[in-house]
């Protein structure tokens, strides 16, 4: 018998996550490691679990994610979006709840590029009047 798995792609800053949600007992695996192992910081673990907790599906699905690029915060955001999209694929009735919480919206904020003549994207060199 084929295992029914639901897929969602999440992106945040430079991070890209490919997330598979399978009916199971609530194991979350990211790049072959457990959630606590991959994201030792508690706040990032909370971010990843948010869509599951909001929809009361914590113990009902196993989550398997492959994530690359960006930093740890961007990766956590990407996994969250991927989980939310996969949950909607699994159960379309969850869409309004996740949409209202903003978990189905891709965060468009990206790093602004550095401009020539400036030290960073907006920071100017110090100007001396006299």
Swiss-Prot record:
Keywords: Ribonucleoprotein, Ribosomal protein. PROSITE patterns: RIBOSOMAL_S9. InterPro entries: Ribosomal_Su5_D2-typ_SF, Ribosomal_uS9, Ribosomal_uS9_bac/plastid, Ribosomal_uS9_CS, Ribsml_uS5_D2-typ_fold_subgr. Belongs to the universal ribosomal protein uS9 family. The lineage of its organism: Bacteria, Bacillati, Bacillota, Clostridia, Thermoanaerobacterales. Transmembrane segments: none annotated. PANTHER family: RIBOSOMAL PROTEIN S9 (PTHR21569), SMALL RIBOSOMAL SUBUNIT PROTEIN US9M (PTHR21569:SF1). This is Small ribosomal subunit protein uS9. One of its GO terms (biological process) is translation. GO terms for molecular function: RNA binding; structural constituent of ribosome. One of its GO terms (cellular component) is cytosolic small ribosomal subunit. Gene3D superfamilies: 3.30.230.10.
